[in-house]
Amino acid sequence: LKAAFFDTPGAARDVLRVGHMPVEPPGPGMVQVRIAVSGVNPSDVKTRGGLGARANPWPRTIPHQDGAGVIEQVGAGVDAGRVGQRVWLYECQLGRPHGTAAQWVTVPEGLAVPLPDGVSMETGASLGVPALTAWYCTAQVEAKPGRCVLVHGAVGAVGFYAAQMARLRGAEVLASVSNEGQARIAQAAGIETVPRGADLPAAARQWLTQRQREGFDAFIDLDFAGNLPVNLLLAENGAQIAAYASDTDLHPTLPVRDLMRRNVRLAFLLVYTMPPILKRQAIAQLTHWLKDGSLHHAQVHPYALHDIALAHEAVETRRHVGKVAVIPDGAPLG
């Protein structure tokens, strides 16, 4: 098979290569999937750069956790009826050296989730890490009717889904954007927006006042350290913060007394160690939303396999609003 890989961590252009590797046959409980689209996540880029949250001990790694494709072979114990099934994939490179940046990947069958009719391969490859993280965040902050939720990063991969999911759970949601272009994208998905930066507190206060509320019950945050001051300023007593990243500072000093005064509860989340029972619940709910068309999905920006270094750089520099993906050579259509 043709695949992209790296042998040592480093800059994308320095370490990513494309070449041929043996195809792994599916063993018991495994499926072999022909990859149509390979999704690129910030965590994939961090792993390749040696900055991942988990160790990557393999001598040669095919990157990327997420993707979508068609099951071509199954191992012993797997229903033969799954051959030909369209699936979306998640955590393919978790605890394994081979991810989805290849023409084929072989994974435990539970990581290949049926992709509902009418849902594109591009969308399927966009789920995985972002959608499961978003569901986890909305569950942790108990998004439901009567609660107001502020989502930081309305058009980020996680934030775009999190804002929608919180609304689908019945919460009232406000989400931050960096510019008018981002606001238009978010608003087209039914998300109310507020500008990031110095104007955010006043604009958010006005939004709360219109709802006769004094503060937010919950925050879903892509930068815990950077956004903590504004979150504290806008927090209702007993508010919850679900943080899935803190790139500006992984070792922040916490204003413990201020957090105590407002009885703020903190939840730090990593989808890769999310309890299996919650992951199953997330997949079931996500499948329901996919089938009934409740979710809007980010625009996909595709790169050819031989341009994978450019794809990784696009994620690192936030070149696009939407999802970066890699298309393996000879990828199946549909």
Question: Positions of the model-derived regions?
Answer:
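Glycine-rich phosphate-binding loop and adjacent beta-alpha segment
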Residues: 226-294, 328-334
